[in-house]
Amino acid sequence: MSSLLQAIGAIPNFTDINFLFVKIYLIMRLIKGKKIQLGVVGGGPKSWIGHVHRISSRFDNQYEIVAGVFSRNSKLSKSFGQTLGILKERCYSNFREMAEREAKRKNGINVVAIMTPPSSHQIIAEKFIDKNIHVISDKPFAGNLYS
C-alpha cells in the first residue's frame, strides 16, 4: 500500500478529470507490479534538469526510462540514449518520430516526460496526446496564456 500512496503523492493533484484518469491508469499499472514505461524528450547530456529527472525517476523504482530524444542533434541524441542503457531502436532523432513509433509498439511508453524549454512544451505534448500517450510536464505548458 505504501507504493500506492507514494505513486499518488508523486503525481501532482490536478483538478481536470483527464488527469484523474492518468493517475488511475498509472496507479493500476503499479498495482499489477509493472513499472511505468517512461519516455523522455529533452534532458540531454548538457541538461542539469535532465540529470535530476533521471535520478528522481529511480527513487521509488516505479519508472523505467525506455525511450527518448535527448538532443536536437540526431547522432548525439542516439548515442546519449544508449549510454543511459536505452535500446538503440528506441533512441530517436525527434519527438514526432518517437511518438509515432512508440504508439505503434506493443510495449510502447506509457508516459512521456517533457524536459525542453517551455515554449516547445505545447507542440510536443499535443503530439503525444494525439497518440494516446500520457504527458508529464513540470514547467509552464505554453509560452503564453493565449496558447
What are these regions (language model features)?
Residues 90-147:
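Beta-loop-alpha module in the N-terminal Rossmann-like domain of NAD(P)-dependent dehydrogenases
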Residues 1-27:
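N-terminal amphipathic/basic-hydrophobic helices that include classical n-h-c signal peptides
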Residues 24-86:
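N-terminal Rossmann-like dinucleotide-binding module
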Residues 8-9, 56, 124:
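Intrinsic structural disorder/low-complexity segments
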